[in-house]
C-alpha cells in the first residue's frame, strides 16, 4: 500500500515534525512494507530525517503525480482546514483533498482540528470534501462542524497522534543537570493579540520564579517562537532562560521532565498531558480551548488573548495556584493521558477500515 501525507511538514515546526514522526512510525508498524510519501516544504530533509519519499509541496505537477500514485491520501494531522491563517492556506489543503477524491484515491481527513472557518471557508470545505470516505478529528467542536458541513460522512472523534509519542531518555541540554529542577517550560508563539500579553505572561513567569521554579522558554516553532520568547523575557524581573531546540527529542525530553508547562503551542500542551505534567494554557485558538475541555482541565487560562478588559484573572495568581496544586493536577493529567492515548489510536483504527474497503 502507498500512502501520501499532506500536512504542515518540512517547515521546521517541531510540533508538526513530532506528528509526522508518530504517524510514519504507526503506519510502518501496521502496514509493513508500505511506501510513505510526504508533501514537504523541504523534501530532501524530510526524506532523510524520516526515511520516506518526499514531494515538494508547492510543485503542483509533482503533487498531482504523487496523488495519482497513492493508494490512500491522508490530509493531516493538524489544523489544516481553517482560514484563520489565510484563505490561500485553506485552498491549498482543501485542494489536495479535492484532487485526491477526483482521482479516485481513498481519501481521509486524519486527526485534524477543523476551523475557524468563515462563510467562504465553510463553503470551500463543503465543496472540496464531497465524496470523502473517512474522517477523524481531534475535538468535539471539530466533529460537530465537519458533520454539519459534510452531512453524509461519518466523522469520528479521536485525539492527536502525538499522544502516542514514546517516553524519551532523560535529556541534558547545554550541560544542564539536576540543578535546573524544579523546571517550568514555556512554549509561546506570536498571535494577533500577542503584544497585549507579554506583560501578563511575564508576571506569571516572575511569580513562578519567586516560588522557586527554574523557568525555561522552549521555541518549538523555530525562530519566530524564539523572537516571541525574547520579547517576554525582556519584560521579566526574573531571569528565565531561552534554550535552543534543534530536535524533537530535546523538546519531548524537557517537557516530560518539567513540573509545569505554560503553553500557547498546542503540541506543548499535548506533550505535557502525555507525560502527566500540569499546565497553564494560553488559548489563542479554539483548538487549545477544545483540548482543555476534552480532558476536563480545572485551571483557568494564564491569559486569554482577545478577552474583554476586566474579564480576566490575575496571571501571577493563576501561576501561584497552578504551582501549589501541581501534585494533584499531575494525577488528573496522568489519567487524562491514558484516555487520550486510547482516542489517538482511533485514527489508525478508522484508517484500517478504509484500507480494507
Where do the model's predicted regions map?
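Active-site anion-handling motifs in enzyme catalytic cores
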Residues: 1-357
Amino acid at each position: 500500500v502507498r500512502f501520501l501525507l499532506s500536512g504542515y511538514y518540512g517547515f521546521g515546526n517541531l510540533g508538526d515534525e513530532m506528528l509526522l514522526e508518530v504517524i510514519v512510525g504507526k503506519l510502518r508498524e501496521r502496514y509493513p512494507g508500505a511506501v510513505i510519501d510526504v508533501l514537504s516544504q523541504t523534501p530532501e530533509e524530510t526524506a532523510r530525517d524520516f526515511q520516506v519519499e518526499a514531494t515538494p509541496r508547492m510543485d503542483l505537477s509533482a503533487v498531482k503525480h504523487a496523488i495519482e500514485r497513492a493508494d490512500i491520501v491522508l490530509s493531516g494531522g493538524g489544523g489544516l482546514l481553517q482560514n484563520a491563517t489565510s484563505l490561500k492556506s485553506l485552498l491549498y489543503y482543501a485542494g489536495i483533498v479535492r484532487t485526491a477524491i477526483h482521482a479516485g484515491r481513498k481519501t481521509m481527513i486524519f486527526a485534524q482540528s477543523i476551523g475557524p472557518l468563515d462563510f467562504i471557508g465553510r463553503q470551500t470545505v463543503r465543496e472540496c470534501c464531497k465524496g470523502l470516505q473517512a474522517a477523524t478529528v481531534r475535538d468535539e467542536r471539530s466533529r460537530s462542524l465537519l458533520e454539519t458541513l459534510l452531512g453524509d460522512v461519518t466523522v469520528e472523534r479521536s485525539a492527536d497522534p502525538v499522544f502516542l509519542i514514546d517516553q524519551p531518555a532523560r535529556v541534558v541540554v547545554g550541560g544542564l543537570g539536576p540543578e535546573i529542577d524544579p523546571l517550568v517550560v514555556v512554549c509561546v508563539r506570536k498571535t494577533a493579540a500577542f503584544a497585549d500579553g507579554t506583560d501578563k505572561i511575564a508576571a506569571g513567569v516572575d511569580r513562578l520564579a519567586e516560588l522557586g521554579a527554574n523557568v525555561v522558554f522552549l521555541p518549538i516553532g523555530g525562530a519566530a517562537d524564539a523572537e516571541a520568547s525574547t520579547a517576554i523575557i525582556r519584560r521579566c524581573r526574573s531571569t528565565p532562560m531561552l534554550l535552543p531546540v534543534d530536535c524533537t527529542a530535546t523538546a519531548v525530553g524537557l517537557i516530560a521532565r518539567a513540573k509545569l508547562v505554560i503553553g500557547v503551542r498546542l503540541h506543548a500542551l499535548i506533550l505535557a498531558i502525555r507525560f502527566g505534567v500540569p499546565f497553564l494554557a494560553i488559548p489563542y485558538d479554539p483548538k487549545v480551548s477544545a483540548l482543555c475541555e476534552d480532558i476536563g482541565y480545572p485551571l483557568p487560562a494564564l491569559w486569554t488573548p482577545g478577552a474583554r478588559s476586566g474579564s480576566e484573572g490575575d496571571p501571577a495568581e493563576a501561576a501561584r495556584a497552578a504551582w501549589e496544586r501541581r501534585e494533584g493536577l499531575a494525577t488528573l493529567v496522568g489519567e487524562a493521558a491514558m484516555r487520550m492515548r486510547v482516542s489517538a489510536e482511533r485514527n489508525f483504527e478508522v484508517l484500517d477500515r478504509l484500507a480494507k474497503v
